[in-house]
Amino acid sequence: MEYPWLQSQVHSFSPTLHFPSFLHPLDDSKSHNINLHHMSLSHSNNTNSNNNNYQEEDRGAVVLEKKLNHNASERDRRRKLNALYSSLRALLPLSDQKRKLSIPMTVARVVKYIPEQKQELQRLSRRKEELLKRISRKTHQEQLRNKAMMDSIDSSSSQRIAANWLTDTEIAVQIATSKWTSVSDMLLRLEENGLNVISVSSSVSSTARIFYTLHLQMRGDCKVRLEELINGMLLGLRQS
C-alpha cells in the first residue's frame, strides 16, 4: 500500500550532502596549465639570470683586456721617451751629461746648446777656409821664392839666405848653399835666441845646389830681429 504523502515528506527532508572543499576533485587541466606556466616563468628567469652573468663576465673580460693593453702601450711609450731623452742627453758636453738634469732641464739645455754648436761649426768652417787659402798662398809664394833664389844664385856665391814673415810670429827661412852642411849648431843658436824650430826640410836642385827650408816661430822672449837672424845664419854657414 502506497502512501504518497510519506514519500513527499521523505523527499522534502532528504539531506543534501556537501563535501568539504579539500574533498572536491581537482580540475586536472587547470592545475596542469598553472604548473606549466609557473615552470616556464622560472626557466625564463633562470635563463635571463645566466645570460646576465655571461654578459657581466664578458664585459669584465673586455675591460681587463683594455686595461692590460693600455698599460702595455704606456710602458712602451715611456720606454721610447726615455730612449729619446738619452739621445738628447748624449748631445750635451760631458760635464752636462754627468749632471743629474731633469727632463725639462735636459730639453732646455739641448735647445740652447744646438744653436751654439751650429754657430761654432760655422766659425770653424770659415777659419778652415781662411787657413787653406793662406796655406795655398804661402805655398805658391814659397815656390816663387825658391825659384827666384835658385835663379839668383850664381857660381860665385856659395851661400844665400832669404827670410819671409808668414804671420806676426812665424818666419820661413830658405837657405841655398853649394855644399852639405850641418845645421844643428845653427838650430841650437836659434833656440837660444827665442825661436822655436817647427820644421826643417832640404832639397837638391839640378845645379847641385842644396836648399834648406826652415819654419820658425818666435817666442815671447825672442829678442833677435830678422836682419840679425839672417846675418847670423850666414856667418854660421860661412864658418861651417
UniProtKB/Swiss-Prot annotation:
Gene3D superfamilies membership: Helix-loop-helix DNA-binding domain
This protein's GO CC annotations: RNA polymerase II transcription regulator complex
Keywords: DNA-binding, Nucleus, Transcription, Transcription regulation
Subcellular location field: Nucleus
UniProt cross-references to CDD domains, sorted A to Z: bHLH_AtORG2_like
Cited InterPro entries: bHLH_dom (IPR011598), HLH_DNA-bd_sf (IPR036638), MASH1/Ascl1a-like (IPR015660)
Main location: nucleus
Tissues expressed in: Flowers.
Induction: Up regulated by iron deficiency in roots and leaves, as well as by nickel, high zinc or high copper treatments. Repressed by high iron, low copper and low zinc treatments.
One Pfam family of this chain: HLH
Protein name per UniProt: Transcription factor bHLH101
Organism: Arabidopsis thaliana (Mouse-ear cress)
Taxonomy of the source species: Eukaryota, Viridiplantae, Streptophyta, Embryophyta, Tracheophyta
The gene coding this protein: BHLH101
